[in-house]
Amino acid sequence: MDASFDKAAANYDDTFTHTAVGKMQRALVYAELSKHLTSVKNILEINCGTGEDAIWFAKQNFNVTATDISAKMIEVARRKASLNFQTADINLIAKVFENEKFDLLFSNFGGLNCLSKSELENFFATVDSILAEKGKLALVIMTKNTLWERFYFLAKAQFKNISRRKKESVLAHVDGENITTYYYNPKDIVNLANANFETVSIKPIGFFIPPSYLDGFFKNKKGFLRFLNRMEQGVKNTTSLSKYADHYLIILQKR
């Protein structure tokens, strides 16, 4: 997995971070996440990519440690800011930081979708050990039922792909690389995490705002994209739409 994301590192900001869709989806995450940061001081980010979120946290005066399995992603992040960026595997994260405690563990835009169900079970079974009392997880995860993708494949007459996210795993295309990806609806995460975490909130990210792979289509339709963004603002607190969005933000608190 690390080598695959190494190849994506050089172009990741251009193909997602700095796109109009990427900025809109990230703004949604920040607006909701900010509601849960009042008692937070120390943050651990996993799957930090090129460091965009770690830089945002640092600008809010949080102590942030940001990790990614891809050494190339970490190289790009370190060129952008002098923060505590480290190469680390999600599956070993509780071991790597066994002597530390964090108030918040954050994973943005589908980082945890790289984990199989058994790996995700292990993550939830162990990660509470590095969280402070009442510490939280803030996780942005890709769903099984996103309507945008269904409409996209229907329009392209690719009928066999309409429900592809419901398969056990899918090879997702990321900057020329095929990444094994697992999709989880909110209920899946609630059930997997329930032993050690209680659910605080679940909010849709990208119900009207399209997935990032459609940014090119909307490049010359900025007015329509702004309209979709306004529509998004009207449903951003509607939990029931979360499993139909591109992503959702789930906040879990350590029991």
Could you describe each region identified by the protein language model?
Residues 178-196, 202:
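Short alpha-helix
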Residues 201-255:
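A C-terminal cap/extension of S-adenosyl-L-methionine-dependent methyltransferases
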Residues 95-104:
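A short acidic, Gly/Pro-enriched loop at the edge of an enzyme's catalytic core
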Residues 121-133:
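A short glycine-rich, Lys/Arg-flanked "PGG" loop and its adjoining helix->strand segment in the class I
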Residues 50-93:
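Class I SAM-dependent methyltransferase SAM/SAH-binding core
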